[in-house]
Amino acid sequence: MTAMNEPWPCASEFAILSSDVHARWKNFGNWDRTYFPKLVGLQVEDIRLGYCRMVLPFREELEQPMGIVHGGAIATLIDASVVPAIGSAYDNTIGYSTVDLHVQYHNALIKEDAIAEAWVTKRGRSVVFCESEVMGRTSGKRIARGFMTYNISTLRPMTK
């Protein structure tokens, strides 16, 4: 885990993905059916092995009554931004789910896009630890930081 005052790792520190894995994760959330990531408008800007940069474009619908972006939208960005970072190391037979999510809010996000830089800090056999840093795209302000633990498992066929 990086210290609170340390900057997050740079994308260039992470290995480039094969073209097929990159294509799979670059389109995260842009599926035929509308799932939650697409509903809130999340977009992957960069994906590498163990790393993802994702944007939450500003929309008025994401604001709370005081005119700032709702903390739940920021928490969603934090949680979702690590999914491609985790998944970049696995094939489609592996599932993962959030076990723990801790968010620290530093500043309000006001009428600007949020950019999350997310990375895997440690991979175990059944658990992955991740971090995500959210900044305002135009202001450059640190908006929030997230620390997550994900469970890793083999997918089982769905039954009716």
Where are these regions (language model features)?
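Terminal targeting signals and extreme-terminal segments of soluble enzymes
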Residues: 1-160
